[in-house]
Amino acid sequence: MFVKLLPPEVRKVIAAGEVIESPVDVVKELVENSLDAKATKVEVEIVKGGKRLIRVKDNGTGIHPEDVEKVVLQGATSKIETEKDLMNISTYGFRGEALYSISSVSKFKLRSRFFQEKEGKEIEVEAGNILGTRRVGMPVGTEVEVRDLFFNLPVRRKFLKKEDTERRKVLELIKEYALTNPEVEFTLFSEGRETLKLKKSSLKERVEEVFQTKTEELYAEREGITLRAFVSRNQRQGKYYVFINKRPIQNKNLKEFLRKVFGYKTLVVLYAELPPFMVDFNVHPKKKEVNILKERKFLELVRELAGKEKPIVDIPLSQPVKTYKPTYEILGQMDETFILVKDSEYLYFVDQHLLEERINYEKLKDENLACRISVKAGQKLSEEKIRELIKTWRNLENPHVCPHGRPIYYKIPLREIYEKVGRNY
């Protein structure tokens, strides 16, 4: 038998099948696009579990009208340009396959208004064939409508699960992305009814709202790896969620490891931040699998985190004020943005805005107001103000991250500094 190149239309369907297997895959790709577009509101609507209709609307930055026709082409992406870029991915999407794959196996319509334009542009595609484009009036953002998924692949359509099963999978997916994007409001409609509404909140509030339980917050960092976990013990059934650089990870081995170190009847929501070069998401077309460069050190830090019943604190940040004794030295302000603090082991670079934002949030419980009234980067502080901020920092309930989840400080071991210049510490 002679080897032949497959016709383009056949290759198109095969490629689409690697990325899109069910309605939840469509929702995943579209929600990721919305988040990459900096949306603060994402609305998802499904009918018949997504088999009949999937619609995703957002208020993100939108797509430039010149790019609307490009986004449904294979390999069309604004995220990467070279192979090296694959090692520094900071967005959800990067392959340039999602909209191409979805539009190849559905009746597809996309309308988007770029934030610098006065009107939007709509494109309609059926089974990969562009039917036409037109100008439309709409707010800034993007709306994608996917009808009759796999209408041109009847065999694939037969393998879809029952509507209730597909609906539950979509609901679970929305919760996962809501868990790692608390600053975004998520709404899910099914059969015309609102089934989920999550308004923007702090990360801890979002976790507790999704799971309807109080949690204990844990924190650890080492060698560029930052871990933050929310744990609730004595659950009827253990649940384990892992997010690496804000991306949900489906890894059975890692979840089994969490079961062993945290316990089998524990809710664990683990957030890991790693430098992009340490993580390879380009393992599987669905980006669900991941390779970690320093996996052993990562797991060691997770084990250490699990052994803590209270948040890990590297310096005594939670001493009662009346027994307060300085164990640190304030070195001054750097670039009118960071406060430099040194203790017996570390040099800390403390972000002055994020620190006061956390202080104000713990007083007011309003993250937006806390942000607005806090000192800004680029603002020169008096010595008295610096002392006040650092003293309060040491007594915060959560001294590690701001209400939006950004780290308040970065620390360098003093031993490492001395070793770099060839001195003993």
Swiss-Prot record:
GO CC term, one of those recorded: mismatch repair complex
Gene Ontology molecular function: ATP binding; ATP hydrolysis activity; ATP-dependent DNA damage sensor activity; mismatched DNA binding
Chain segments annotated as transmembrane: none
Protein's GO biological process: mismatch repair
Pfam families registered for this protein in UniProt: DNA_mis_repair, HATPase_c_3, MutL_C
Keyword set, alphabetical order: DNA damage, DNA repair
SMART domains, A to Z: DNA_mis_repair
Family according to the record: Belongs to the DNA mismatch repair MutL/HexB family.
Function recorded in the entry: This protein is involved in the repair of mismatches in DNA. It is required for dam-dependent methyl-directed DNA mismatch repair. May act as a 'molecular matchmaker', a protein that promotes the formation of a stable complex between two or more DNA-binding proteins in an ATP-dependent manner without itself being part of a final effector complex.
PANTHER family on file: DNA MISMATCH REPAIR PROTEIN MLH, PMS, MUTL (PTHR10073), DNA MISMATCH REPAIR PROTEIN MLH1 (PTHR10073:SF12)
The protein's name: DNA mismatch repair protein MutL
Taxonomic source organism: Aquifex aeolicus (strain VF5)
